Regions:
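Generic start-of-chain signal for non-secretory N-termini
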Residues: 1-14, 18-19, 26
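Acyltransferase donor/substrate-recognition loop-hinge adjacent to the catalytic core
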Residues: 2-5, 140-219
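Hydrophobic residues on conserved beta-strands that form the core of alpha/beta folds
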Residues: 4, 78-81, 193, 293, ...
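A conserved beta-strand-loop-helix scaffold within acyl/acetyltransferase catalytic domains
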Residues: 18-61, 66-76, 195-296
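Alpha-helical subdomain
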Residues: 46, 71, 270, 340, ...
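Short hydrophobic/aromatic beta-strand or adjacent loop that forms the aromatic wall/cage
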Residues: 53, 159-163, 346-352
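Flexible loop/turn segments at secondary-structure boundaries
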Residues: 64, 120-122, 171, 255-257, ...
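Acyl-donor binding region in acyl/amide transferases
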Residues: 76-154, 273-341
Length: 356
């Protein structure tokens, strides 16, 4: 009834691997980047040189029913499970998890961590609530029964994350003395908070690389990238950023902070790009109803700067009468309390591990 296949680059298995998400998700739910997945499976992705992928499928009555990839990094005692998809069938999932566990034990790995789709820089975490809402841009969407499948196979939650849902900002409904004072204090000290121009993107992306590499290095599953690979990986952001919602902070000619807020393209950026998609992207980029606060970082030694950076972003949100999402915050971090008065609810995500 069930058959587990570990494959390499065979066309049939690659096509079945890529097909499965379309069988599980509706068009409004799916967040599959098929071209990126294919490049990874064929070791042709810009990041492929950093890891080795081991690919698994499960067939039920000759039909593809589950999939995953185990990512291996040289010198790392952990194996990473990602690109996990499965029909709602606990026995099918058990077959896959059992095969993966046996592989990891055979190769002397100490634990399996996931979901991690090959890299920290691509996608990780599992969504555990608010499945009634359409995915927002960059959200790692999955079926609501996936957590149970992992837990049933002895995985345990090792990290928790939240995304804050902020209510609509308007000129009259929101004032925050804390961020106002922080902003004024930093400006008076000589800090410059500015939005880059699109033509400066090539310069700015290098500044952000240096900050992110330094500030995110203590995150679980973080792996450093070479600067040229980081720039290549994020080159498309040039076309989807609303640069008025990007903030860089300079102090004494040094870049000490950044704040990247994306228009909410939902899942429009996945799949085939046609005229309707391009039109939706164009409209959202000009004036979105919702924005996603995706990346924020402050150099050590500049305590409180994060709240100051938010001030000009909030002013833009008020002017546009938009809602916002503060995305993917490690639970307990100070960023979880940014603009606390406007938080209406929270999306929740987890990272899991299996000790071997």
């Amino acid at each position: 009834m069930y058959k587990v296949v570990k494959f390499n680059e065979e066309d049939k298995y690659i096509n079945d691997f890529l097909k499965l998400p379309k069988l599980i998700y509706s068009k409004k739910e799916i967040v599959q980047n098929e071209s990126e997945e294919r490049a990874l499976l064929l070791s042709k992705h810009i990041l492929s040189k950093y890891f080795v992928l081991h690919k698994f499928l499960v067939y039920k009555n000759s039909e593809v029913a589950a999939r995953c990839v185990i990512t291996i990094y040289e010198g790392d005692s952990s194996a990473y499970i990602g690109f996990f998809e499965c029909i709602e069938d606990s026995l099918c999932a058990e077959k896959l998890f059992s095969e993966v566990k046996a592989f990891a034990i055979k190769n002397n790995y100490k634990k399996i961590v996931g979901p991690v789709d090959a890299s920290f820089w691509l996608k990780y975490r599992m969504k555990v609530n608010k499945f009634e809402k359409r995915p927002y841009v960059s959200e790692p969407y999955n079926k609501n029964y996936y957590l149970d499948l992992f837990l049933q196979n002895k995985y345990k939650v090792c990290e928790n994350y939240v995304s804050n849902m902020y209510g609509k900002f308007t000129p009259k409904n929101f004032q925050d003395e804390k961020i106002e004072k922080r902003y004024e204090n930093f400006i008076n000290k000589g800090y410059k908070i500015t939005s880059p121009k699109k033509e400066d993107y090539d310069k700015v992306i290098h500044e952000i690389y240096r900050l992110i590499t330094n500030l995110y290095s203590d995150f679980p599953i973080f792996k450093p990238l070479k600067e040229e690979d980081f720039v290549s990986l994020f080159k498309s952001y040039r076309y989807i950023l609303d640069f008025s919602m990007v903030k860089l902070v300079y102090f004494k000619k040094e870049t000490v902070g950044f704040f990247i807020c994306l228009p909410d393209y939902k899942n429009f950026l996945y799949g085939k790009i046609n005229l309707i998609t391009l039109f939706r992207v164009f409209l959202n980029k000009r004036k979105s109803k919702n924005y996603v606060m995706l990346y924020v970082g402050v150099q050590r030694g500049h305590l409180g700067l994060g709240n100051a950076m938010i001030k000009p972003v909030v002013e833009k949100l008020k002017k546009r009468r938009a809602t916002a999402i503060g995305a993917f915050i490690r639970e307990g971090k100070v960023t979880e309390s940014y603009v606390k008065k406007k938080i209406q609810s929270k999306y929740r995500y987890v990272l899991l591990e299996l000790e071997l």
